[in-house]
């Protein structure tokens, strides 16, 4: 274990034997740091926070602070961060609320760039990238492999489906379908995240099926519900298309982000 002499570690904190804590960092009494965690200088980890193995946290990040919620009265709530995340300078991640889920959950293998923020009760998947200054309001749910551009923001309770792309400066006030690409303020659906799908090695047949389903789903004929039912019938055997259908059919707190002509 490598602890800089200027670091402050609460005696009750649970640190794996190979954890590194850099200069002027602070680790609170209800914190657990798994194997291989590295806190660089001036990092604050407080609250009931667990950081998974191999995470690297850069200077001036604050993890496990209380939720920015007027109803919070100091109840014990948690922040759980999965393994192998890179958390850059000035990132903030807050614990949950007692009136919500009570826990904020971060998946594995993510990149959280400078100044990005994850608010209370969020659920973030694996391999997620939040670019510089990206912000998640409370209770936001993000699927795996989402890329959120610089200074983009997601409204509280919104859902962002797997493999979707959020353009820089976008204001996401509605749910984003899996594999979608959204831009603008307020954000609107521009199409599918074809670049991301190709980079992740999706087969051509799957991409073609997603494109066909998207064209039908957002066509001009019939009602949206009728078109959605047609997509579900035609592509019943395609897992990725049905993921979009199921996402849309799931009861949600926010409306669906649509192409501009559908808004």
From Swiss-Prot:
Q: Which domain of life is it from?
A: Bacteria
Q: Which key words tag this protein in UniProt?
A: Acyltransferase, Cytoplasm, Lipid A biosynthesis, Lipid biosynthesis, Lipid metabolism, Repeat, Transferase
**What's an example of a GO molecular-function annotation for this chain?**
acyl-[acyl-carrier-protein]-UDP-N-acetylglucosamine O-acyltransferase activity
Top EC category = transferase
Q: Which InterPro entries match?
A: Acetyltransf_C (IPR029098), Acetyltransf_C_sf (IPR037157), Hexapep_transf_CS (IPR018357), Lipid_A_LpxA (IPR010137), Trimer_LpxA-like_sf (IPR011004)
Q: What is its main location?
A: cytoplasm
Q: Does the keyword Hydrolase apply?
A: no
Q: What is its subcellular localisation?
A: Cytoplasm
Pathway the protein takes part in: Glycolipid biosynthesis; lipid IV(A) biosynthesis; lipid IV(A) from (3R)-3-hydroxytetradecanoyl-[acyl-carrier-protein] and UDP-N-acetyl-alpha-D-glucosamine: step 1/6
What cellular-component terms does GO give this entry? cytoplasm; membrane
The record lists the catalysed reaction(s) as: a (3R)-hydroxyacyl-[ACP] + UDP-N-acetyl-alpha-D-glucosamine = a UDP-3-O-[(3R)-3-hydroxyacyl]-N-acetyl-alpha-D-glucosamine + holo-[ACP]
Q: Name one GO biological process term.
A: lipid A biosynthetic process
EC number(s) recorded for this UniProt protein: 2.3.1.129
Write down the Pfam families for this protein, in alphabetical order.
Acetyltransf_11
Assembly and interaction partners: Homotrimer.
Family membership noted in the UniProt record = Belongs to the transferase hexapeptide repeat family. LpxA subfamily.
Functional summary from the UniProt entry: Involved in the biosynthesis of lipid A, a phosphorylated glycolipid that anchors the lipopolysaccharide to the outer membrane of the cell.
Q: What is this protein called?
A: Acyl-[acyl-carrier-protein]--UDP-N-acetylglucosamine O-acyltransferase
To which species is this protein native? Caulobacter vibrioides (strain NA1000 / CB15N)
């Amino acid at each position: 274990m490598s602890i800089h002499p200027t670091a402050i570690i609460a005696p009750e904190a649970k640190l794996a034997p190979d954890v590194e804590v850099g200069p002027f960092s602070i680790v609170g009494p209800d914190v657990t740091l798994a194997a291989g965690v590295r806190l660089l200088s001036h990092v604050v980890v407080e609250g009931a926070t667990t950081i998974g193995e191999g995470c690297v946290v850069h200077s001036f990040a604050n993890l496990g602070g209380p939720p920015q919620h007027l109803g919070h009265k100091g109840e014990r709530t948690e922040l759980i961060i999965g393994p192998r995340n890179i958390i850059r300078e000035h990132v903030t991640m807050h614990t949950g609320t007692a009136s919500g889920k009570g826990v904020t959950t971060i998946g594995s293998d993510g990149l959280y760039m400078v100044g990005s923020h994850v608010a209370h009760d969020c659920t973030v998947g694996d391999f997620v990238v939040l670019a510089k200054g990206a912000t998640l309001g409370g209770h936001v749910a993000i699927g795996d492999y989402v890329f959120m551009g610089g200074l983009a923001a997601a409204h509280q309770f919104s859902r962002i489906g797997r493999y979707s792309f959020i353009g820089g400066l976008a204001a996401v006030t509605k749910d984003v379908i899996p594999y979608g690409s959204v831009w603008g303020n307020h954000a609107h659906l521009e199409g599918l995240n074809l670049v991301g799908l190709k980079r992740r090695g999706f087969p051509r047949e799957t991409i073609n099926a997603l494109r066909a389903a998207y064209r039908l789903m957002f066509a001009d004929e019939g009602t949206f519900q009728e078109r959605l039912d047609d997509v579900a019938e035609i592509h019943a055997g395609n897992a990725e298309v049905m993921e979009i259908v199921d996402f849309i059919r799931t009861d949600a707190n926010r409306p669906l982000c649509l192409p501009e002509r559908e808004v």
